[in-house]
From Swiss-Prot:
Enzyme nomenclature, EC number: 3.5.2.3
Stated role: Catalyzes the reversible cyclization of carbamoyl aspartate to dihydroorotate.
Record protein name field: Dihydroorotase
GO terms, biological process: 'de novo' pyrimidine nucleobase biosynthetic process; 'de novo' UMP biosynthetic process
GO MF terms held by the record: dihydroorotase activity; zinc ion binding
Annotated SUPFAM superfamilies: Metallo-dependent hydrolases
Length: 344
């Protein structure tokens, strides 16, 4: 039987929620991943060092006994952010600030309205070596939802990189050929996280044969040509600039199967197996370890995990749903098969 042993991976983009939801989902990530970069878009958002440290304590309390999993904490960038906050964050071990353009995604109401007014804050991030994590979509209602990432590149990303050229930027959950091209052409201070859904699915999987709410995420799934461009990027000559970030974003089944369903796919349960499928299909299984376990750690300036995990070429059936507080949660590929299984 084919096996693949790799350095334990890290999830560089994860939503863990809070309260009972946190307790339900944290163990799935802790089983596979050594660390995860925790998104700060709670209600209310994680905007201060005190908020982040309190949230980290709640995450640690939700982990299974004996777990070595480490949450890497971030702050939610707001219009009120200051260079002093950046210095405080650095001193407290916060790894990054996250940009949510106001209204772009789940719990982004407190997001930034004009990033260019925060240039002194970004300059302090560059000085302190704190990363800038970007949800790269414009929110202009005149821009089609399928074009919002591409529009962001010209309107925001390129001008910011020109003004703060040494800022370390992660273009999060990229979905387009344009975003991949930007990262490939930019300096070594720019990298990207890529989700399993944007490597495996296209917008037909969302809309053909009926609306499939469990495939609805933001940024929304794109054309097949964009999916192919992402696979080419994560397996190509400059693959070191791309890394694993699931954007696993749990919402109760009732909130997804809804007249106004929530955006987000829950992939944490079988994340590394889904990525293994991507790399296997691309004939690049030998590049999975770098993508999952090395590139993100190197970009964040942290050592790789010291232990390993082993994947077995053995099919598994993903549960139709799992418990989630008082409700249930539908995982990515619910009821379907994945050709790989982690040996626990």
């Amino acid at each position: 039987m084919q096996t693949l042993t790799i350095i334990r991976p890290d999830d560089m983009h994860l939503h863990l929620r809070d309260g009972d939801a946190l307790k339900a989902v944290a163990p799935y990530t802790a089983r596979q991943m050594g660390r995860a970069v925790i998104m700060p878009n709670l209600k209310p958002p994680v905007v201060s060092v005190a908020d982040a440290l309190a949230y980290k304590a709640r995450i640690m309390a939700a982990l299974p006994e004996g777990s070595a999993f480490e949450p890497l904490m971030t702050l939610y960038l707001t219009d009120q952010a200051t260079p002093e906050l950046v210095r405080e964050a650095k001193a407290a071990g916060i790894v990054a600030f996250k940009l949510y353009p106001a209204g772009a995604t789940t719990n982004s109401d407190s997001g930034v309205t004009d990033l260019f007014k925060l240039i002194p804050v970004l300059e302090e991030m560059a000085k302190q070596g704190i990363l800038f994590l970007v949800h790269g979509e414009v929110t202009d209602p005149e821009i089609d939802i399928f074009d919002r990432e591409a529009a962001f590149i010209g309107r925001v990303m390129k001008p910011v990189l020109a003004q703060v050229p040494n800022l370390k930027v992660v273009f999060e959950h990229i979905t387009t050929a344009e975003a991949a091209r930007l990262v490939l052409e930019a300096g070594d201070n720019v990298a990207a996280s890529v989700t399993p859904q944007h490597l495996l699915l296209n917008r037909n999987d969302l809309l053909v044969g009926g609306v499939r709410p469990h495939h609805f995420c933001l940024p929304v799934l794109k054309r097949e040509t964009h999916r192919q461009a992402l696979v080419a990027a994560v397996t190509g000559e400059k693959a070191h600039k791309f890394f694993l970030g699931t954007d696993s974003a749990p919402h109760a089944k009732s909130a997804k199967e809804n007249a106004c369903g929530c955006a987000g796919m829950f992939s944490a349960m079988t994340a590394i197996e889904l990525y293994a499928e991507v790399f296997e299909k691309a004939g690049a299984l030998d590049k999975l370890e770098a993508f999952a376990s090395e590139n993100g750690a190197r970009f964040y300036g942290i050592p790789e995990n010291a232990d390993t995990i082993t994947l077995v070429k053995q099919s598994q059936t993903v549960p139709a749903s799992v418990p989630y507080g008082d409700g249930e949660l539908v995982p990515m590929r619910a009821g379907g098969e994945i050709g790989w299984t982690v040996q626990y």
